[in-house]
């Protein structure tokens, strides 16, 4: 294996995956949210960059082809687990996350079972779109934590009556509470909608992979 830049970026993305969760054990919020968001977005961008550079410089390798989907899955799975811990077990979050995790385990199991025939389960364009939507959804949901915590910090010491008057426009909004609340709502519902879209694409691509694997699953084992 050659340590080309695309391979280095892939390894860095894999190494960054647990950092998204661990940072919440090291830093208080919202600083942890900021670092997790920056780390996740940077890692997601390397997913595009390493493939682009590998094609541009003709530096494709078996190592990169093997590690790239593993790094993607590690980033998504660890980030989703982190979000579940941050948001709690909300129905709107549990269902799409469960669908995404089930599909990832199912397809990985299919590939392992097929062995040298796993080449029939090549990554499709729709699967790439699925990964892109997943990563955008996760980034948006991490940003929700930032808006939520800045809002919470700014209302400390304010009575509910004052907060209500600010939202009613009766008192000057010096701390931008209305804007923070609006952006938090947009990030939350936007992230949830994108996550459900990703879950739908996840199911569709999972069924597609199963259909492609079925001819091999019907084969009788040879003695």
Model-derived features: where do they sit?
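Cytoplasmic-side transmembrane-helix entry/capping segments in multi-pass membrane proteins
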Residues: 67-70, 98-99, 124-130
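Membrane-embedded alpha-helical segments that form the functional core of polytopic membrane enzymes
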Residues: 18-66, 79-101, 186-199
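C-terminal membrane-associated helical module and adjoining short loops/tails
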Residues: 2-6, 16-17, 35-44, 118-223
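Core segments of transmembrane alpha-helices
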Residues: 13-20, 71-80, 107-108, 130-142
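Helix-loop junctions at the membrane-solvent interface of multi-pass transporters
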Residues: 23-27, 85, 113, 143-144, ...
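Extended, non-globular alpha-helical segments
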Residues: 1-29
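A cytosolic-side transmembrane-helix exit/cap motif
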Residues: 52-60, 112-123
């Amino acid at each position: 294996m050659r340590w080309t830049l695309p391979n280095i970026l892939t390894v860095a993305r894999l190494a960054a995956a647990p950092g998204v969760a661990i940072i919440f054990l090291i830093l208080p919020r919202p600083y942890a949210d900021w670092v997790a968001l920056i780390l996740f977005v940077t890692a997601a961008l390397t997913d595009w960059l390493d493939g682009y550079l590998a094609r541009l410089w003709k530096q494709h390798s078996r190592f990169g082809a093997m590690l790239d989907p593993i790094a993607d899955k590690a980033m998504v799975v660890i980030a989703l687990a982190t979000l579940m811990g941050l948001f709690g077990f909300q129905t709107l979050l549990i269902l799409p996350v469960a669908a995404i995790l089930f599909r990832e385990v199912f397809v990985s199991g299919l590939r392992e079972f097929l062995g040298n025939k796993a080449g029939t389960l090549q990554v499709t364009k729709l699967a790439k779109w699925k990964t892109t939507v997943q990563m955008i959804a996760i980034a948006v949901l991490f940003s929700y934590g930032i808006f939520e915590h800045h809002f919470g910090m700014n209302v400390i010491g304010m009575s509910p009556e004052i907060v209500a008057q600010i939202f009613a426009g009766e008192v000057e909004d010096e701390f931008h509470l209305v804007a923070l609340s609006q952006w938090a709502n947009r990030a939350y519902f936007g992230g949830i909608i994108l996550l459900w879209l990703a879950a739908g694409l996840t199911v569709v691509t999972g069924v597609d992979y199963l259909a492609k694997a079925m001819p091999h699953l019907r084969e009788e084992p040879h003695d």
